[in-house]
């Protein structure tokens, strides 16, 4: 049974957030924040860089809520009070660990193969990482997860990546619910939805945020919106958890240029463009899935079809071969160094022997990719 007051760190619950100048007033003759009154030495599109940005970002949060409430037909609508914003999802991940886990004592649980920053953030915070492998089909092993949570009360956060990275598979909401409803575990379930816009709409855990007080969903503008360069992420969670996370964050963690770009990205016109890009990516994903598996030496797609990338195996022989890390690594390195076509080698991840993670590119990029794979694999098998 989830209890916020015993789940989170006592010192965090007692934290009095820093109150900055812009929490009180943002208009008029502003002589309260020791800013440069004469303005900024640079000027871009009328942005007042000499002023500290809005610490609450209500407009950006509201636009995200409007988008998700409409798309998902959420019965208990999300509001800005459900959101904490961060410098990419990585800041959100770190914040969730810091509010929950006492360094050197508490733990997180994750399910490899998964996003590596969960481990990195945990290690930085001196938090142990407990691992329960995904099933061979990359679904959650719910029984093993629940058993682990039952046995170890030091686990305070469970991280699930959906769609998974590198698996490209969206997790079943029924599995997420079973973990949220664990009868004895007191902790937060985090569902990282960086790639959710490339999957079916009914796969998002956002529909559950106002149903479960122990759920936190991470989203970003980096993927479907094409804004990886501005570094902005969102945690959509219960209002009590969001309040605590907003108390913990740096007072001006989202810059004014980033805020304005995010606001523009969440406008109706930009959302329409996002949908156009997303549809084109999904169309090219279908093409890649079809054509990659016809190339001699390429194995099966072992991941799902819910992201803007594909997880596929490379074989040790052109026909009748087995997944091979040597072949996959050769293909990866030769393409990158000799042909300037860069993918990611993922063969050292659990359940990913001989696997490459390939981002879905434009039609032209994918044509180059397919030709390059054929060429390099021919070279590899000829040399063997």
Swiss-Prot record:
Modified positions (N6-(pyridoxal phosphate)lysine) in chain numbering: 223
InterPro entries given in the database record: Aminotrans_II_pyridoxalP_BS (IPR001917), Aminotransferase_I/II_large (IPR004839), HisP_aminotrans (IPR005861), PyrdxlP-dep_Trfase (IPR015424), PyrdxlP-dep_Trfase_major (IPR015421), PyrdxlP-dep_Trfase_small (IPR015422)
SUPFAM superfamilies recorded: PLP-dependent transferases (SSF53383)
Pathway, per record: Amino-acid biosynthesis; L-histidine biosynthesis; L-histidine from 5-phospho-alpha-D-ribose 1-diphosphate: step 7/9
Cellular component GO terms held in the UniProt record: cytosol; nucleus
Keywords noted in UniProt: Amino-acid biosynthesis, Aminotransferase, Histidine biosynthesis, Pyridoxal phosphate, Transferase
Enzyme class, UniProt record, top EC level: transferase
Gene Ontology annotations of biological process type: L-histidine biosynthetic process
The keyword Transferase is assigned to this record: yes
KW Cell membrane (keyword) present: no
UniProt GO molecular function: histidinol-phosphate transaminase activity; pyridoxal phosphate binding
Cofactor(s) named in the record: pyridoxal 5'-phosphate
EC number: 2.6.1.9
Catalytic activity reported: L-histidinol phosphate + 2-oxoglutarate = 3-(imidazol-4-yl)-2-oxopropyl phosphate + L-glutamate
Source superkingdom: Eukaryota
UniProt similarity note: Belongs to the class-II pyridoxal-phosphate-dependent aminotransferase family.
Protein name according to UniProt: Histidinol-phosphate aminotransferase
Organism: Schizosaccharomyces pombe (strain 972 / ATCC 24843) (Fission yeast)
């Amino acid at each position: 049974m989830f209890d916020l007051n015993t789940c989170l760190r006592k010192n965090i619950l007692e934290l009095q957030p820093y109150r900055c100048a812009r929490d009180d007033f943002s208009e008029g003759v502003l002589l309260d924040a020791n800013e440069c009154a004469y303005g900024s030495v640079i000027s871009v599109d009328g942005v007042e860089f000499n002023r500290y940005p809005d610490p609450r970002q209500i407009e950006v949060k509201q636009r995200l809520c409007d988008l998700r409430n409409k798309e998902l037909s959420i019965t208990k609508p999300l509001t800005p009070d459900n959101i904490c914003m961060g410098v990419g999802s990585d800041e959100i991940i770190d914040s969730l660990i810091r509010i929950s886990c006492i360094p050197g004592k508490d733990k997180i649980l994750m399910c490899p193969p998964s996003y590596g920053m969960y481990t990195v953030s945990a290690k930085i915070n001196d938090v142990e990482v407990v691992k329960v492998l995904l099933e061979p089909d990359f679904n959650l092993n719910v029984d093993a997860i629940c058993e682990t949570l039952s046995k170890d009360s030091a686990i305070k956060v469970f991280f699930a990546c959906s769609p998974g990275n590198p698996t490209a598979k969206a997790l079943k909401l029924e599995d997420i619910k079973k973990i949220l409803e664990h009868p004895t575990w007191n902790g937060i379930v985090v569902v990282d939805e960086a790639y959710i816009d490339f999957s079916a709409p009914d796969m998002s855990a956002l529909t559950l945020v106002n149903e479960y007080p122990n759920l936190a969903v991470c989203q970003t503008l980096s993927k479907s919106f094409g804004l990886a360069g501005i570094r902005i992420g969102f945690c959509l969670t219960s209002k009590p958890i969001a309040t605590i996370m907003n108390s913990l964050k740096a007072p001006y963690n989202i810059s004014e240029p980033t805020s304005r770009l995010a606001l523009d990205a969440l406008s109706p016109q930009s959302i329409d463009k996002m949908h156009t890009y997303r549809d084109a990516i999904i169309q090219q994903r279908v093409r890649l899935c079809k054509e990659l598996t016809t190339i001699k030496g390429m194995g099966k797609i072992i991941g799902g079809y819910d992201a803007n990338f594909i997880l596929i195996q490379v074989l040790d022989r052109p026909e009748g071969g087995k997944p091979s890390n040597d072949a996959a690594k050769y293909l990866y390195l030769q393409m990158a160094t000799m042909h300037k076509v860069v993918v990611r080698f993922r063969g050292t991840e659990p359940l990913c022997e001989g696997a490459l993670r390939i981002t879905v590119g434009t039609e032209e990029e994918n044509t180059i990719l397919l030709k390059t794979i054929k060429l390099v694999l021919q070279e590899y098998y000829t040399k063997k």
